[in-house]
From Swiss-Prot:
Entry keyword Lyase: no
Protein name: Translation initiation factor IF-2
Location of region: G1: 197-204
Gene that encodes the chain: infB
Compositionally biased region (Basic residues): 69-81
Principal subcellular localization: cytoplasm
Cellular component terms (Gene Ontology): cytosol
A GO molecular-function annotation: GTP binding
Function, as annotated: One of the essential components for the initiation of protein synthesis. Protects formylmethionyl-tRNA from spontaneous hydrolysis and promotes its binding to the 30S ribosomal subunits. Also involved in the hydrolysis of GTP during the formation of the 70S ribosomal complex.
Pfam families according to UniProt: EF-G_D2, GTP_EFTU, IF-2, IF2_N
Region (Disordered): 54-105
Binding site for GTP: 197-204, 243-247, 297-300
Residue ranges of every copy of the tr-type G domain listed in the record: 188-357
Organism: Bacillus thuringiensis (strain Al Hakam)
Protein location: Cytoplasm
Length: 686
């Protein structure tokens, strides 16, 4: 008899993997997870256990007979008792009259109560409360407001406990959107899956392969519609896939406080191995704290080497189960559709172990996946219902917009009336276009939804005018003192891998007042927009060593208010972070980049050196500014301008979209395509 895995045995005997693992523990048999192999001896023991628990045929027959008899008896009782119905009603009415209202053990209130309201809560007559107040020297009428102290005084006289409720503003519904429901109200929901990985490793092909094999097969006449998410059905269970750019599912949405994804599928090409974006995807998934399933794609290629992929991923703490780890690896060929069913089975297995649940019997809450403005339909938004049930006609607040759900369309283009947890739907009826990652909540009353939506829009406008509270080195010490910061997230970029490792190792050793440094991402090369988005989502500081941010990264950093620190000496980085944590950071000057020029042509002139014919692409270049030469995103020289000319004339500055001639002091190795970045040092007002 061949060996069998835990999840395979569970499936064979129609039980959950979790229940089987519990059973094995009761039998003192150690299993690490659902992929553990069971030998023949253990399988025999389990067979005997489950055989013993099954009732015999005779027992089942006896139970069935009792049920049939009880049904017959109940029918007789029904006939017999029909004539006594009036008497029972009379007795019930009589008992109801003699019942006395019990005094409660505890009452709750918020703000204040009138005498009448307090009497109602205490189950007393208002005249009795007025009399008690009179005895305390307080002249009150039935509609008079009572303060907290008076309410407590009266309630204590009756021996009743008082609790004041703190009302959370409904405009900030994000604070109670994620409140835990009672366990008995929770029901199983489909897992929400995002596919991530390096460019050209087969993410889109895998999504298409899953969609074509599972979605269209079960939907006769259904039109697959791109709404940013879709559902597939496997073994009578559903899985929701987010069809968005991989990183957007984590960064943009997490930056707005939305946790959408339950499971990440990391696609790695078997012939290519781990690439820079693969590492980036791993760091995004780890920062979001979600399980990772590795799909080793392109197994049909002659150069496929899955062992190499496994080996490389162990460096990032993704150890295969076959090697004693807990990461699931699934070999697939997305283009040929091989291994897809196995991958979907593994997703269901992780869902079963993680136990994803939600309460369908409440007003819907969730997150915006995509949104756009359509000429014919107006505002269209794809929503992922994460809790509750959304219905057509529900008043809804989405981010700072509001409206009523006029129509709902499923991922296969069909109109639906209800959408439960983990279901993606496209809705119309909002007054303006929300942003991806905005939270939404349905309400009972349209007037209330409008009021909350308008209040949120006003609050957002006021908040936009104020400063964003992102982490920066300047206010780091103050935040540590106030207890707001327990861990500092850093993103480290450098010109070479050796510098990255040295800097990361040095930074990890810093520990001031129990506040530790956590490096969430490292990389080689220029600081990119993706780094800034991750920093914004994780409230991190970006540190660049011998590298610069590109134009898009700078623009995004200003927009998201992300702190970027650039250095050329490692110990200066360490000193600056330590000084900031100890509250001794006192920068007198701050570097301000004023412009960039691209070298279009070079001329070598005797006794002068290399003259660079440049085109100013951004800002301006001034005669007295410091400059640095950037080649392929890496700083190769830093110094001063020697000459700055327009045609044959010396000039003080050259503005954007103009050409100029530049020479650099003590540097002649200028090449076409180099970027000359000009900067000045400005005094910082403290």
């Amino acid at each position: 008899m061949s060996k069998i895995r835990v999840h395979e045995y569970a499936k064979k005997h129609n039980i959950s993997s979790k229940d089987l693992m519990t059973k094995l523990k009761e039998m003192n048999i150690e299993v690490s997870n659902h992929m553990t192999m069971l030998d023949d001896e253990v399988v025999n023991k389990l067979d005997n256990e489950y055989q013993a628990e099954k009732p015999s045929v005779a027992d089942e027959f006896e139970v069935e007979e009792k049920v049939v008899r009880s049904k017959k008896n109940s029918n007789k009782k029904k006939k017999k008792g029909k004539g006594n119905e009036d008497k029972r009603q009379e007795n019930f009415a009589g008992r109801q009259q003699t019942q006395t209202v019990e005094t409660p053990d505890k009452i709750t209130f918020s703000g204040s109560l009138t005498v009448g309201d307090l009497a109602k809560k205490l189950s007393k007559e208002p005249s009795e409360i007025i009399k008690k107040l009179f005895m305390l020297g307080i002249m009150a009428t039935i509609n008079q407001d009572l303060d907290k102290d008076t309410i407590e005084l009266i309630a204590n006289d009756y021996g009743i406990e008082v609790e004041e409720e703190v009302i959370v503003s409904e405009t900030e519904f994000e604070t109670f959107i994620d409140e835990q429901d009672d366990e008995e109200n929770l029901k199983e929901r489909p897992a929400v899956v995002t596919i991530m990985g390096h460019v050209d490793h087969g993410k889109t092909t895998l999504l298409d392969s899953i969609r074509n094999s599972k979605v269209t097969a079960g939907e006769a006449g259904g039109i697959t519609q791109h709404i940013g998410a879709y559902q597939v059905e496997v073994n009578d269970k559903k899985i929701t896939f987010l069809d968005t750019p991989g990183h957007a599912a984590f960064t943009t949405m997490r930056a707005r406080g939305a946790q959408v994804t339950d499971i990440t599928i990391l696609v790695v090409a078997a012939d290519d191995g781990v690439m820079p974006q693969t590492v980036e995807a791993i760091n995004h998934a780890k920062a979001a704290g979600v399980p990772i399933i590795v799909a080793v794609n392109k197994m049909d290629k002659p150069a496929a080497n899955p062992d190499r992929v496994m080996q490389e991923l162990t460096e990032y703490e993704l150890v295969p189960e076959a090697w004693g780890g807990d990461t699931i690896f699934v070999p697939i060929s997305a283009i040929q559709g091989e291994g897809i069913d196995n991958l979907l089975e593994m997703i269901l297995l992780v869902s079963e172990v993680e136990e994803y649940k939600a309460n369908p019997n409440r007003y819907a809450t969730g997150t915006v996946i995509e949104a756009q403005l359509d000429k014919g339909k107006g505002t269209i938004a794809t929503l992922l219902v994460q809790n509750g049930t959304l219905r057509v006609g529900d008043p809804i607040v989405v981010g700072t917009s509001f409206g009523r759900v006029r129509a709902m369309v499923s991922d296969i283009g069909r109109r639906v009336k209800v959408a439960g947890p983990s279901t993606p739907v496209e809705i119309t009826g909002l007054n303006e276009v929300p942003q991806a990652g905005d939270r939404f909540m349905a309400f009972a009353d349209e007037k209330k939804a409008r009021q909350i939506g308008e209040s949120r829009a006003q609050e957002a406008l006021l908040a936009q005018r104020g400063e964003k509270s992102k982490l920066s080195l300047e206010d780091l010490f103050q935040q540590i003192q106030e207890g707001d910061v327990k861990e500092i997230n850093l993103i480290v970029k450098a010109d070479v891998q050796g510098s990255v490792e040295a800097m990361a190792a040095s930074l990890r050793k810093i520990d001031v007042e129990g506040v530790k440094v956590k490096i969430i991402h490292t990389g080689v090369g220029a600081i990119t927009e993706s780094d800034i988005i991750l920093a914004s989502a994780s409230n991190a500081i970006v540190i660049g060593f011998n590298v610069r941010p590109d134009v898009n990264a700078k623009r995004t950093a200003e927009l998201e208010n992300v702190d970027i620190r650039l250095h050329r000496i490692i110990y200066k980085v360490i000193e600056e972070i330590e000084a900031a944590m100890q509250g001794m950071l006192d920068p007198e000057f701050e570097e301000k980049v004023i412009g960039q020029a691209e070298v279009r042509q070079t001329f070598k002139v005797t006794k002068v050196g290399t003259i660079a014919g440049c085109y100013v692409t951004d800002g301006k270049i001034t005669r007295d500014s410091g400059v640095r030469i950037i080649r392929d995103g890496v700083v190769i020289f830093e110094g001063q301008l020697d000459t700055l000319k327009r045609f044959k004339d010396d000039v003080k500055e050259v503005a954007q979209n103009y050409e100029c001639g530049i020479t650099i002091e003590r540097y002649n190795d200028l090449k076409e395509g180099d970027i000359i970045e000009a900067y000045i040092m400005e005094e910082v007002k403290r």
